[in-house]
Amino acid sequence: MGADLYIRKLFDPQMKKYKRQIQIAVQKRDSALLSSDKDKAQKEVDRLYNIMYSKGYWRDPYNKYEVLDKMKFSYWVDFPCLTKNVKGRRMMSPENAKMLACLLEKRNMNLRGFNAEEKEYFKKGKNELIQFLNSASKLKQSIECSI
């Protein structure tokens, strides 16, 4: 489980382009008889999946690796103030995305108790989230927030 954020203008074309290719790769994997063929096919599924989710999508898990939490923000407390319900979807305006990006840029992360590799994960995640929010702002696109 986690928070899934989408910039539909970027994500939907990726989904449309790669969904069928992934389905074919999954069928190939599932019909493979040898474990080496299954492994090879799974690598192709993973590769296509990573490409499909490489644009217009950001995910934050609901566990100790939640990036937003390390900056003392909450999907349940703060996001309702930054989003509104539009036809059953939680949407964040481009203006609120820019505001949140600015707030996050200034926030320090509480990374006490994490090792160097984990700290790097959080720093990278923070930068990716800020870039994601700024992309929505620059494109003047709302963010769909599945939280």
Specify the residue positions occupied by each region the protein language model found.
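Acidic (Asp/Glu-rich) sequence patches and key acidic residues
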Residues: 1-147
